């Protein structure tokens, strides 16, 4: 039916002009990908197009040819349709050769076509939109906005603004946080917040699409505490206008039973199918859960049990309380006018109404690292393979130590990969990375493998750590200085785009560090670190046990004869 409607009413110059304007904006706003991603993206089409047209081919919309379009539509008949469905409970009659699973193929019956024609859905062609040339007057880069500055502050709202130092300002990024302590207070609020987020996203899809056609990507998603963050990326000229409209939609939002049921099903399906996700994703989730790092502080069973009891009125009651406690936290980067930004912050606070949260709120972290202790989480999963993540957490909240961990991992990571992946072939994923866990510096080592011996994997990690400590003492000062220079050169290079340029500031804004100095402080600590600093730090952990160990182990349930790692089973 819809194909017929398209043929009769959808092939119009107005719809073509909408597509053409959308593609022109997308081409003008083209952002280059990192080198490897760009290479993979371009080579996928290299046999179909001339190399000179590989990028622009997706955006070229030159001539409207109704006859050509109708000719293509005429070939799209119901009889030629192919339907693909993926699900855990489908009947199969053919096994896959190189993977676990199977499939079936069946003909679509004539009765199916007849039933589909009886559909009660009302189909219609969307009205063509006029995508106007909305370039606003340019704003000059202001000297005082190289780093974020507070441009507005009042009860229940604050706004920070910085100006790009490397780009024209045609593109910007805008972050709007609707912040309250309520979502993370208890399990019921956490569930209500998640349901509301999904409901709001589902209900406003057309709005996101309308913004996207005008060169603005919009990502409404929760932060680690379950609070809604509206993130805008793309053309600067209309971002504030769309942001105001979205805040108004949030303020006015009411849900119906159907939207609630859809949201509940999405979350139920996610958690019920969680064990089938990639092992790397499960390792991340169980790591957070082991140390109670938001948002993953509740077990899957707790979440599923709570979800099954929830009703629409529970979400409505939560939203009413939430609306009365929102602190509006705003950060923008690009070339927004400070005056326009102040007015936007003030108007947005008025849209949301009064609040009991006058000052910025950030979660108080009561996590403690206890030297010489270990936490283990052992999980049996249905999918094949095993995974282990072994984390060494330093027992002091120190940005200096974290900076030194960055140097250590720059030396450690390739050696760890070469030793356990290339030489010993213990897994198909072998990696390490530095991070901050609840503000404590940490180094994590990850192995994902078909090897079923978790005891052996953990012992290999321990042996590697001892070997690396000995090798570190023999590394030359020249190698250390070269490693530091490589890290600093990477940090100081011109960012690929405005979103990378603002990334460090966005991180500080989310953490409540309104000095916005984390990146610069890390650079200073890296530059001043010596070989002796690194050796002493590494030895204090490896030989003196100045750390807390977090160990997460996953293995397929069918491997009954394969043991999890335990300290008691350590070989001499």
Question: Where are the predicted features?
Answer:
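Active/ligand-binding-proximal structured segments within catalytic/core domains
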Residues: 1, 169-210, 247, 267-270, ...
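A glycine-rich, aromatic-flanked flexible loop/lid motif
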Residues: 164-170, 217-220, 377-388, 421-442, ...
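Catalytic or ion-translocation cores adjacent to nucleophile or general acid/base/metal-coordination motifs
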Residues: 201-227
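Short, conserved charged micro-motifs
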Residues: 93-94, 185-187, 239-241, 338-342, ...
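M16/insulysin-pitrilysin zinc metalloprotease superfamily fold
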Residues: 1-27, 188-189, 207, 222-274, ...
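Extracytoplasmic
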Residues: 78, 169-173, 213-215, 225-227, ...
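Short beta-strand-to-loop capping motifs
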Residues: 178, 232-236, 332-334, 392-394, ...
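C-terminal regions of mature proteins
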Residues: 14-166, 283-370, 376-382, 395, ...
């Amino acid at each position: 039916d819809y194909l017929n409607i398209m043929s009769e009413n959808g092939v119009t110059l107005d719809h073509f002009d909408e597509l053409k304007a959308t593609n022109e904006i997308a081409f003008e706003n083209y952002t280059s990908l990192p080198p490897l991603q760009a290479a993979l993206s371009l080579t996928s089409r290299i046999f179909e197009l001339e190399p000179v047209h590989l990028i622009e081919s997706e955006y070229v919309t030159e001539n409207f040819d109704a006859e050509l379009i109708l000719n293509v539509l005429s070939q799209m008949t119901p009889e030629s349709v192919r339907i693909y469905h993926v699900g855990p409970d489908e009947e199969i009659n053919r096994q896959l050769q190189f993977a676990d699973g199977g499939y079936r193929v069946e003909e679509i019956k004539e009765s199916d076509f007849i039933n589909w024609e009886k559909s009660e859905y009302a189909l219609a062609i969307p009205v063509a939109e006029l995508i106007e040339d909305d370039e606003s007057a340019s704003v000059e880069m202001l000297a005082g906005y190289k780093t974020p500055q507070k441009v507005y502050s009042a009860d229940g709202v604050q706004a920070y603004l910085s100006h790009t130092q490397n780009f024209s300002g045609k593109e910007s990024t805008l972050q709007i946080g609707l912040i309250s302590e309520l979502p993370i207070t208890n399990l019921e609020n956490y569930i209500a917040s998640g349901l509301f987020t999904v409901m709001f996203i589902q209900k406003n899809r057309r709005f996101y699409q309308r913004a996207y056609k005008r060169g603005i990507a919009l990502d409404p998603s929760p932060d680690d505490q379950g609070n809604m963050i509206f993130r805008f990326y793309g053309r600067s000229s209309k971002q504030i206008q769309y942001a105001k409209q979205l805040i108004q939609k949030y303020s006015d939002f009411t849900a119906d039973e159907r939207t609630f049921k859809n949201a509940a099903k999405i979350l139920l399906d996610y958690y019920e199918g969680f064990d089938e996700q990639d092992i790397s994703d499960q390792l991340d989730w169980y790591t957070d859960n082991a140390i109670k790092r938001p948002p993953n502080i509740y077990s899957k069973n707790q979440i599923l049990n709570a979800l099954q009891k929830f009703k629409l009125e529970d979400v409505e009651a939560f939203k009413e309380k939430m609306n009365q406690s929102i602190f509006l936290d705003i950060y923008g980067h690009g070339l927004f006018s400070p005056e326009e930004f102040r007015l936007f912050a003030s108007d947005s606070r008025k849209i949301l109404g009064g609040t009991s949260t006058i000052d910025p709120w950030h979660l108080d972290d009561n996590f403690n690292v206890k030297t010489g202790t270990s936490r283990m989480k052992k999980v049996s999963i249905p999918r094949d393979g095993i995974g282990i993540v072994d984390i060494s957490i330093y027992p002091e909240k120190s940005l200096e130590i974290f900076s030194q961990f960055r140097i250590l991992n720059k030396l450690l990571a390739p050696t760890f990969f070469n030793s356990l992946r290339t030489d010993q072939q213990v897994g198909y994923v072998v990696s390490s990375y530095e991070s901050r866990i609840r503000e404590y510096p940490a180094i994590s080592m990850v192995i994902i493998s078909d090897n079923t011996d978790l005891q052996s994997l953990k012992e290999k990690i321990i042996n590697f750590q001892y070997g690396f400590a000995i090798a570190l003492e023999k590394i030359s000062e020249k190698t250390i200085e070269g490693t530091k220079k490589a890290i600093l050169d990477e940090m100081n290079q011109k960012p690929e785009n405005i979103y990378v340029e603002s990334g460090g500031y966005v991180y500080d804004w989310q953490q409540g560090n309104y000095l916005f100095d984390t990146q610069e402080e890390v650079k200073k600590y890296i530059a001043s670190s010596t070989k002796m600093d690194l050796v002493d730090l590494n030895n204090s952990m490896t030989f003196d046990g100045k750390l807390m160990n977090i160990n997460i182990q996953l293995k397929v349930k069918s491997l009954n004869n394969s043991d999890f790692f335990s300290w008691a089973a350590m070989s001499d």
